[in-house]
Amino acid sequence: MSPVPSVTAVQVENVLFPPSVKPPGSTNDLFLGGAGVRGLEIQGKFVKFTAIGVYLESSAVPTLAVKWKGKTVEELADSVDFFRDVVTGPFEKFTKVTTILPLTGRQYSDKVSENCVAFWKSVGIYTDAEAKAIEKFNEVLKDETFPPGNSILFTHSPLGALTMSFSKDGSLPEVGNAVIENKLLTEAVLESIIGKHGVSPEAKKSLAARLSELFCKEAGDEKIEAEKVAPVAC
């Protein structure tokens, strides 16, 4: 396994996302890919509801760099395909959604379900299996309440399991509250945040900027290794 990239923490409002975490249900340390708020314009004022951090397994950097290194931050931020590759890539992801305003599980699950189903229908992949997965997703969240500072946690396995858990104090539990075995749901939850119609443009920009920097470093490290093997005259 690749070493975890050295990255900085990100402060979003009063929520600090650390540089790396070990998600519930995982044996891996993941690095902070990016973070940002989710909000809505209400009566001319931008109201912030949640702070969202997206973490990635270290293998994400070399995997994504093959196709995306050399692109500018703006090119990455504007590319639907780039974020689709992040969502569907063969590496683990972890999403931490921390409330800024109070939120009920029902409010959260209704919105996420709506976004997931809309995405599936738009690409023609909504089946009974996805309907059952959404039903379980809603069931896990329906009786939960999230005062400010509480978190909803998603560990996205590349094998297709979505581990759901909750945190009241900022700490991360070792195991999840529920595991839903459905690859499309595992991807769609993250797609709803950073995909084409993702709810956090700020998190998308943060991901693009931080991954672009890591791609540059990856390319630089490859060049240094190549020059060790075959020194290049200056």
From Swiss-Prot:
Enzyme type, top EC level: isomerase
Entry-linked Gene3D superfamilies: 1.10.890.20, 3.50.70.10
A Pfam family per the record: Chalcone
Protein's pathway: Secondary metabolite biosynthesis; flavonoid biosynthesis
Keywords: Flavonoid biosynthesis, Isomerase
Reaction(s) this enzyme catalyzes, per UniProt: a chalcone = a flavanone
EC identifiers of the protein: 5.5.1.6
Source superkingdom: Eukaryota
GO function terms (MF aspect): chalcone isomerase activity
Binding positions (substrate): T50, N115, S192
GO biological process: flavonoid biosynthetic process
Protein task: Catalyzes the intramolecular cyclization of bicyclic chalcones into tricyclic (S)-flavanones. Responsible for the isomerization of 4,2',4',6'-tetrahydroxychalcone (also termed chalcone) into naringenin.
Record-stated family: Belongs to the chalcone isomerase family.
Official protein name in the record: Chalcone--flavanone isomerase 2
Organism: Vitis vinifera (Grape)
